[in-house]
Amino acid sequence: MGDKGARPLPSGGPSVFEHRSVLLEEVAGLLSGCRRILDGTAGAGGHARRLAEAGALVVAIDRDPDAVRAARATLGESATVRQLDFADAARDSDLSSLAPDGILLDLGVSSPQIDDASRGFTFRPGAPLDMRMTADDGPTAAQWLNDAPAAELGAAFADFGDEPRARALAREIVRRRASHAFAVSDDLVNAIRAVLGPRSGPADFARLFQAVRIAVNGELDRLARALPGLLGVLSSGGVLAVISYHSGEDRIVKHVFREWARDCGCPPRQPVCTCRGRALGTVVTKRAIVPTPDEVAANPRARSARLRAFRKAA
């Protein structure tokens, strides 16, 4: 991939896939010294645009073809935009030759994806239970709800949805699907209401729909597998920044960054170091950076965002 300078940014109106980027200036600050940046989750191109404005060479990738089209409309020729999953970035020869000194991941689902009922991420009435990031990603949410064993359903609602009645909800889904296959959002909403009671509402639906989405897309496993590869692609002294929105995602990022920063890889109870290990770098953010109250007021979906960064050893 040839080296090219940042070109003028397009000034046209917003695209249909309009999305408000979270922690925009905080990301720009963490990556301010980077000259070659890989945006691993392009979305509508908001972060990439801000980084390109600062003079960086930006390559933006996304697994979602709708996001790729939106990012291209936003960025024009100011950045290179490709359809590629960040989990596959380490195996891509063009990205390896780029040798980025900055990498950004903004995890989760963007507002346009949530708001597009046809994508199946929403609990709006009649929305299809799809939730896949791309059409060839594997089983839909409906297929997973109809086929997964009760134990798998319960584990997903407990681990990804922090649901105390996860097993009861799993049993209710199994009971209902025996006579009526899950197909649209109403089917899952009604099962949730049957278990959580009449006081259940949008916050519960959002939390449990998110759990299904995470399970269907294998998001936590994908993140855990991708991080070591991205560190390998990152040039020495470079910064890897990750924005997470779910406690499970944040735990993975926090744990991995801490492990990378350890000088010794021996078991904790081993009294003498025998590995002669060397830390892979340092954690830049001792605590996660969170949105300001003003940002949350302007964009409520930013409320759960957590930003962490790691600098690779020189």
What are these regions (language model features)?
Residues M1-A314:
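S-adenosyl-L-methionine-dependent methyltransferase catalytic core, i.e., the SAM/SAH-binding region
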